[in-house]
Regions:
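Short, structured helix-loop boundary elements
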Residues: 4-8, 27, 61, 65, ...
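Extended hydrophobic
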Residues: 165-238
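Amphipathic alpha-helical regulatory segments at dimerization interfaces
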Residues: 17, 33, 84-95, 182, ...
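Amphipathic alpha-helical effector-binding/dimerization core
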Residues: 63-157
Length: 252
């Protein structure tokens, strides 16, 4: 059964697209990118303009507006936690000489929002703002561990990228199961990035997953006693992120 409302889906897609475009987009560009009619684009834009969720700039481009800010207020503690996390991942990377990143879920995507790298000639974490299918790798498992298996299967079906996880859904369910049971997932199998990774979810005060913290390296970095050490490193990092949020709340 499809319980989704097409008009709402299109509106959300438009907002998500504008979130990726700091300079905004014209009505025609939004129509083309989203595959919707000009009249549908117009009605969505006019509705969002009325509520000041978007604004129309002098160059006829639309961009997000501050009418969205009140919606963020209930999540201020989670945002403070994430802001504190940059210091944590910087320390983790420097002290353990391993790449570390923080990712969040954006609908059907996982997005890198923070990263830290040891002093190496090449980077492993990718650029801040990079996005990948939310079902992919250990990051996906950490971000989705609070979702039902039915929701996860729906995300797998919706994924249009040619991934091992798309072809073999059990890979996703197995990794999610590891997070639920052990608190983390490790991805050592061959993947399109030729890297190994270990991820752990970060939760808010209510227990909801708000981000995933990930260590990235070679397969040998996660072998034997090294893995046990890095599990402890990640657990400590998650704890410090949470402590940072609690400390900020206490200062209010």
């Amino acid at each position: 059964m499809n319980n989704k409302i097409p008009a709402v889906e299109k509106t959300i897609a438009l907002l998500e697209l504008l979130a990726k475009l700091p300079e905004g987009a014209t009505q025609a560009e939004l129509k083309k990118e989203l595959g919707i009619s000009m009249s549908t684009a117009y009605r969505i834009l006019q509705t969002l303009l009325k509520h000041k969720w978007i604004r129309k700039n002098a160059d006829t481009k639309y961009s997000l507006d501050n009418g969205l800010l009140p919606l963020l207020y209930p999540f201020r503690n989670s945002m403070e936690l994430l802001e504190h996390a940059q210091k944590v991942i910087d320390r983790v990377s420097a002290e353990n000489e391993i790449a570390c990143k923080l990712s969040i879920r954006r609908g059907t995507e996982q997005v890198t929002i923070m990263r830290a790298e040891p002093e190496e000639p090449f980077a492993l974490t990718g650029q801040v703002g990079s996005s990948f299918p939310v079902i992919e790798g250990s990051v996906g498992a950490a971000l989705l561990c609070g979702e039902s298996d039915d929701e996860i299967m729906e995300l797998i079906q919706e994924c249009s990228t040619d991934l091992a996880e798309k072809q073999e859904p059990e890979l996703v369910l197995k990794a999610v199961g590891e997070v639920r049971m052990k608190g983390y997932a490790v991805n050592l199998r061959k993947n399109r990035w030729n890297i190994a990774a270990m991820s752990m979810p970060i939760r808010d005060a209510e227990g909801s997953v708000i981000a995933a913290i990930t260590l990235i390296g070679a397969e040998s970095d996660f072998a034997g006693k090294k893995r046990s050490k890095l599990v402890s490193v990640l657990k400590d990092a998650v704890r410090k992120c949470s402590e940072g949020s609690c400390r900020t709340q206490g200062e209010e």
